[in-house]
Amino acid sequence: MSDVIKDLSELRLSYEQGELYETQVASNPHEQFLGWFNHALAANLHEPYAMSLATASASGRPHVRTVLLRGATEAGYDFYTNYDSQKGIDLAENPYAELLFYWPSLERQVRVGGHVVKIPEQESTDYYHKRPRDSQIAAHISTPQSGKIESRELLQQRFQDLQQQVQSREVLDKPEFWGGYRLQPDYYEFWQGRPNRLHDRLSYEKIDGQWTLHRLMP
C-alpha cells in the first residue's frame, strides 16, 4: 500500500491550456457558464454535460454521484431522478446542493451551488416522454433507486416483464416517484488550471440579488 501512495505522489501534470482574468469573463455567471459549456461541446469531449452532484443529509452526511445536465437557464440547472433515491431523500431533508463540471482536457472546472426545488410536474412529464422507451421502462422498475436487489438476473427479468406488459401501449405514464430537480444558483466558481499550481479561480456570489465577482487564492 505504501508503494502505491509513493507512486501516486509522483503523478502530476503542468496545466498550460489557458488563463482566466476578470476582464475576460461575463458579468453574468450563467453567460460565462454557457460560454465554457459550448466550448466543451465544440471540443467533442465525452459527455461534457455530465456533472457531479453533491447533496447532504439532515445530519450532514455527504453523498456525491454523477448525473446528467438536462436543462440550463438563468432560472437553474436541471437533472432528473427517482424521488425515492438517496439524492431525493437528501434534498427533502436539506434542499441545498452543488454541481461540479470537470473538463480535464480543457483544464477547467465549474462549481455551481444553490437551493434545489422540484421541477413542475408537467415539465417532468414532457421530459420523461422524450426519453427512449427502454429508459422509460427502466425508470418504472428501478425503484426504490439504490435499494438492494438479489441479483442482476432479477432486475433484467423485471425489465423484460414490463416490456411485454406495455408493448401495446403508445404512451407509458411517468411514474409518480420520478421527476426533475432544478438547482437555483447563488454561487459559481470557475477554475482554470495554470502552471506551478497558481491556478485561476473566479467566483460569483449572489448578494441582495446582484452577482459579485471575486478572485480566489489557488
Swiss-Prot record:
Its cofactor is FMN. One of its GO terms (molecular function) is pyridoxamine phosphate oxidase activity. Pathway: Cofactor metabolism; pyridoxal 5'-phosphate salvage; pyridoxal 5'-phosphate from pyridoxamine 5'-phosphate: step 1/1; Cofactor metabolism; pyridoxal 5'-phosphate salvage; pyridoxal 5'-phosphate from pyridoxine 5'-phosphate: step 1/1. Gene3D superfamilies: Electron Transport, Fmn-binding Protein, Chain A. Substrate binds at residues 12-15, 70, 127, 131, 135, 197-199. Its EC number is 1.4.3.5. This is Pyridoxine/pyridoxamine 5'-phosphate oxidase. It comes from Acinetobacter baumannii (strain ATCC 17978 / DSM 105126 / CIP 53.77 / LMG 1025 / NCDC KC755 / 5377).
